[in-house]
Regions:
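Aromatic-lined substrate-binding rim segments of carbohydrate-active enzymes
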Residues: 48-114, 185-190
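Short hydrophobic beta-strand segments in globular cytosolic domains
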Residues: 31, 437-438, 555-556
């Protein structure tokens, strides 16, 4: 086979890939696979090579990655495989650097990613996702066929680096629809996937059985209990090599909880124990990356180390996918990297080789003056709003991400009224005549929102509602966003709304002006000079809540409640002259300055 690499044309020998009880064989030679997750879609273009260099220096020979359906097909039938979504480029770079690839292209990925990687437009129709429901499976089949065109030429059997392909993700912890799983596998095979197909699940109850496909390779996911998990896997599947699909080297972190790292020595010991058990080990994650834009997911549960009895609720993930991995968000080795590398070479009975020199630069930029500003109230074009007797949710407006602004007019009767937002998804700032009243977060206890409305006087009620990320795992994964049911005033439904979609995709085209007003909700813009190809971090500790852009690229959400206080700006995004834009929901700092840092800042335990 011949395919075009970014640097050269390359002719490659086709291989065979087979599974035996003692290992995975490539061309009848046992392959001692050691792998880790690095997700191309979480890393700004140009940043992959450094992370792969550190992976090679560690001792990895294989990279595992998901493929996010929601980014590759943002609208039905419209596909994107460019920029950060250049799957072919990732596969060619991995091959150039000597890595094999475990590819996980199936429709659902979880991965603390919005809607688990499913496209939001699926929720515009009635269907049962992750099932053999034909209304869902038709879309899943179409996507699978399309993405196969991207990666099938890169299978090992076609001379490429891909040695195995995953079917779905941790399905044993979600459903039990064998037809769905086997039909997905059949689509892959029909598209020419002739390397081993695999699934990965936890080892509790009957997860292996519920999540596997007929004749497939089963892997196990777990935190640290290597011997227990691997022995459970071998008991279920004695005829194939033991494969740890996800050795959880860290943990996902939500907003409003402290960033607590896992014990380094425990992780290194668990990793070494898995090697001693003779299993193929895969770090999840090896390099974390970033949930740029609005791509962070959410859970429905409790935060880490929550007191017993804490009620379950919606908890969104951070922008940074800095889930305490071996390489941090900016792609640099952590103490855990070196501890696990030491454990690897102790297992191999070899001296650790010296670390190679790998170029990296970061910078702190002079405080950025945000002189140009425009209030949301001036920018909001209610002429584009949809008028409706009852408020429309985001899905009814065919809006997938961002904010919505809802407006209605209330007439006072001289009595105090209580405003309630019964099904809010996910967070709302409440304004009366454009004066801030309160913030409401879904499933959180809050004081009744009392409104004192003078008799006969009209008031404009406006609700700025934010979709903070779709749930990525569990039974509550399907849900509408925005105002799902109408707000009430003393139990009576409020009617006659103007519903304005604010996807936050065009903020660079706003009419910014020199202004002193710092009160939110407000857009602000500034210019800064910096050294290209040198990382920096926006220090958002003086701000409240919102999103930030550099050179038109959405870096993601910030929130003063932490534990993440900085937004990562990849050096590859930075030019000599740069523009930063911020949407701040509450207030710009009094001095109008945005600071930066040369490293990330967290509230850590």
């Amino acid at each position: 086979m011949i395919y075009k690499n970014s640097d050269f044309l390359k002719v490659i020998k086709m291989s065979t890939v087979t599974l035996k009880p003692d290992g995975l064989y490539i061309d009848d030679k046992r392959f001692d696979m050691l792998s880790g997750d690095i997700h191309y879609f979480r890393i700004y273009p140009g940043g992959l090579r450094r992370r792969l260099e550190y992976a090679k220096a560690f001792g990895l020979n294989t990279i595992q990655t998901y493929c996010p359906w929601n980014l590759h097909e943002p609208k039905k039938g419209e596909f994107n495989f460019s920029g950060m979504l250049d799957l072919k480029g990732f596969l060619e770079l991995a091959d150039e650097m000597g890595f094999k690839v475990l590819l996980r292209p199936s429709p659902y990925i979880c991965s603390e990613w919005d809607f688990g990687g499913l496209p939001a437009w699926l929720q515009h129709e009635e269907m049962v996702v992750r099932s053999s429901d034909e209304r869902y499976f038709t879309h899943a089949r179409d996507y699978t066929k399309r993405i196969c065109k991207e990666f099938v030429p890169y299978l090992a059997t076609n001379g490429g680096p891909i040695i195995a392909v995953a079917v779905e993700n941790e399905y044993g912890g979600y459903g039990y629809d064998k037809k769905y799983m086997n039909d997905l596998a059949d689509v892959l095979r029909e598209c020419g996937v002739d390397v081993p197909l695999y699934t990965t699940d936890g080892y509790f109850c009957d997860m292996f059985e519920r999540g596997c496909i007929d004749g497939g390779w089963v892997g196990v996911n777990y935190r640290n209990e290597s011997s227990i998990a691997i022995n459970a896997l071998r008991k279920f599947q004695p005829d194939k090599p033991a494969f740890v699909g996800e050795f959880w080297s860290g943990r996902a972190v939500h907003w409003c909880e402290n960033f607590k790292r896992r014990d380094i020595n425990e992780v290194a010991a668990g990793f070494k124990e898995g090697l001693e058990e003779g299993a193929y080990m895969n770090f999840y994650m090896f390099a974390g990356g970033t949930n740029f834009g609005f791509m962070n997911g959410a859970n429905f549960g409790v935060t880490f180390n929550a007191p017993e009895g804490t009620p379950t609720r919606y908890i969104p993930m951070l922008t940074a996918y800095n889930c305490d991995p071996l390489l941090n968000e900016e792609g640099l080795p952590t103490p855990k990297y070196f501890a696990c590398r030491k454990a690897l070479y102790e297992f191999l009975g070899k001296d650790e080789p010296p670390m190679p020199e790998i170029d990296y630069k970061s910078q702190e930029v002079a405080p950025i003056s945000l002189k140009k500003r425009v209030s949301l109230w001036d920018a909001a074009d209610y002429g584009a709003a949809v008028k409706s007797k009852l408020p429309l949710n985001m899905d009814e407006m065919h809006q997938d991400y961002g904010y919505c602004l809802y407006k209605s007019v209330l007439t006072g009767d001289g009595k105090e009224k209580v405003l309630d937002l019964p099904e809010l998804r996910d967070r709302a700032d409440i304004y009366l005549d454009r004066k801030f009243v309160a913030t409401v977060m879904r499933e959180r206890d809050h004081q009744p929102i009392a409104l004192n409305l003078e008799k006969g006087k009209e008031y404009v009620l406006e609700l700025l509602v934010e979709n903070m990320g779709r749930i990525n795992f569990g039974e509550k994964i399907v849900e509408k966003k925005g105002l799902v049911t109408p707000p009430t005033l003393d139990g009576e439904v409020i009617e006659n709304w103007e519903c304005l979609s604010l996807p936050m995709t065009e903020i660079s085209s706003l009419e910014y002006k020199d202004a002193a007003d710092q009160t939110g909700p407000i857009f602000a813009r500034g210019q800064f000079t910096a050294e290209p190809n040198s990382d920096t971090f926006l220090d958002m500790r003086d701000f409240g809540k919102g999103i930030a852009f550099v050179n038109g690229f959405n870096l993601g959400r910030y929130w003063s409640l932490g534990p993440q206080y900085t937004l990562y700006v990849p050096g590859e995004l930075i030019k000599e002259s740069n523009t930063v834009e911020v949407f701040e929901q509450y207030a710009i700092p009094a001095d109008g300055k945005l600071k930066t840092s040369n490293c990330s800042i967290y509230n850590e335990e």
